[in-house]
UniProtKB/Swiss-Prot annotation:
Identification of the protein by name: Photosystem II CP43 reaction center protein
Assembly: PSII is composed of 1 copy each of membrane proteins PsbA, PsbB, PsbC, PsbD, PsbE, PsbF, PsbH, PsbI, PsbJ, PsbK, PsbL, PsbM, PsbT, PsbX, PsbY, PsbZ, Psb30/Ycf12, at least 3 peripheral proteins of the oxygen-evolving complex and a large number of cofactors. It forms dimeric complexes.
Propeptide feature: residues: 1-14
Gene name, Swiss-Prot/TrEMBL: psbC
Binding site for [CaMn4O5] cluster: E367
Alphabetical list of NCBIfam families matching this protein: psbC
Role summary: One of the components of the core complex of photosystem II (PSII). It binds chlorophyll and helps catalyze the primary light-induced photochemical processes of PSII. PSII is a light-driven water:plastoquinone oxidoreductase, using light energy to abstract electrons from H(2)O, generating O(2) and a proton gradient subsequently used for ATP formation.
GO cellular component terms, A-Z: chloroplast thylakoid membrane; photosystem II
Residues recorded as bearing N-acetylthreonine in the entry: T15
GO MF assignments: chlorophyll binding; electron transporter, transferring electrons within the cyclic electron transport pathway of photosynthesis activity; metal ion binding
Gene Ontology BP annotations: photosynthetic electron transport in photosystem II
Amino acid sequence: MKNLYSLRRFYHVETLFNGSLVVGGRDQESTGFAWWAGNARLINLSGKLLGAHVAHAGLIVFWAGAMNLFEVAHFVPEKPMYEQGLILLPHLATLGYGVGPGGEVIDTYPYFVSGVLHLISSAVLGFGGVYHSLVGPETLEESFPFFGYVWKDKNKMTTILGIHLIVLGFGAWLLVWKAMYFGGIYDTWAPGGGDVRIISNPTVSPGVIFSYILKSPFGGDGWIVSVDNMEDVIGGHIWIGTLCIFGGIWHILTKPWAWARRAFVWSGEAYLSYSLGAIALMGFTACCMSWFNTTAYPSEFYGPTGPEASQSQTFTFLVRDQRLGANVASAQGPTGLGKYLMRSPTGEIIFGGETMRFWDFRGPWLEPLRGPNGLDLNKLKNDIQPWQERRAAEYMTHAPLGSLNSVGGVATEINAVNYVSPRSWLATSHFCLGFFFFVGHLWHAGRARAAAAGFEKGIDRDNEPVLSMRPLD
C-alpha cells in the first residue's frame, strides 16, 4: 500500500476512547485516521475518494435545485426579490432569465426549469457517488489507469490541474456566450433603469482588464470589485476563460520545472491546503463583490448597497422639498453645511448631510443627473424622472442592515417594516466561510509541511517527562 505518511513515525495525535472501532472496513490502525476524520481514511483509495467527491457534488447540486424550487414556490412577483429573502433567483435574474425592463419579473418558468435540471443532475451524481463508494473498485489505478493517480506523481498532478483549469475556463466562456449570443444578460446600467441586453462589444483590451488586477483593494480603488460596466465584466470572463484553457493545456502537456518541484509539497493534504487557500480568497472576494458592487449584483434583485440607500434618502427628500418650494441649492442644514447639496473639498457638487461620506457613490438611477462637475443643478430642478424617484424611495427604506437574530433594518423600526438584505446574507456568509476556509488552509498546510519533514504525528507521549513526575496533590 502506498503510504502518504511515514509508518516509522506513526504516533497518533487523535486519542480515541474507542480506537478499535471499524467503519467500512477501515480502522484507525490500518489507515492512520479515526472514523470521524472522514475522507482522510480514503487518501490512498482513489475509487472510494472519487465516490465521496461525486456524492458531495450531488449534495451541492441537490441543495441548489431544492432551494431554487423553494424560492420559486414562495416567490411573489409583486414584491422585489430582495424583500423576499431570495439568494438564488437573483442570480438567475442577473443572467437575464425571466426578467424585463427595470428588473421586473415577467416569467418564472425559467426558474422552475433551472430547479428541476439541478434536481435531476443531483440524482445522477448521487447515484454515481453511492456506486463508487460502495460498489466500484477501491482503487482506480489497476482498472482505469487514466483516472488513477499517486499523490507524489508530479506529472499526473499537474495533468489533473490542467483538466480542472480547462473546465473552469469553459465555465467562464459559458457566461460570455450567454451574454453575447444566447439572450443577453441583465445590465443595471441600461438606459431607463436597467434591462436585459446583448453584450455585443465586450472589453478585450488587456490594459483595461488587467488594470483592475493591479488596482489597490483599499479606499476608492476597489481592485476587481470596482468593475462598473457589463462590457468589462464579460471581457474579463473572456480573458480569464482563455487563460484558464491555455493554462490547462500547458499543464497537461508539460512537466513541472525544477523550481516548482522543489518549492511545493507534493501530497494529498498539500493539494487540499492549496485548494482551501484559493477558495478562501474567492470567499473574501465574493463578500466584497456582493456588498459593494451593483453591476455584477444589480440592486433591482439584491437590494441597494449601504451607500446607495443613504444617497437615495437624501435624493428622496430633495425631490419632496423641492416640490414644496425649497431652494435645494442654498438651503442650510443644522451644521451650516448644505442641507441637500454641497461642494466636496475638490469642488464637485454632492449630496449634503450625513450622506456626504458616500459622495463617490455611482448608481444607474443617479448618474443621468450628473454634469461635468458632480450633480447638475439644472438637471436636478428639471430632469428628474418618475422612475428615478420611485427607485430611490424604494432603496431608501431597504438599507442592507441586519443582525445575528435575523431582525433586519433600523433599530428604531418595528419588525413589520424591517427585512434582511440579501447583500447582508451573502456578504456575511462569504466572509465567515472565507475565514474558516483560510483557517483550514493554514491547518492543512502546516500538517502537510510537517508530514513532508517526517514529524506529522507529534511526539511519543509514552516518553514524556511529565509522566514520571509526582501528582500535584
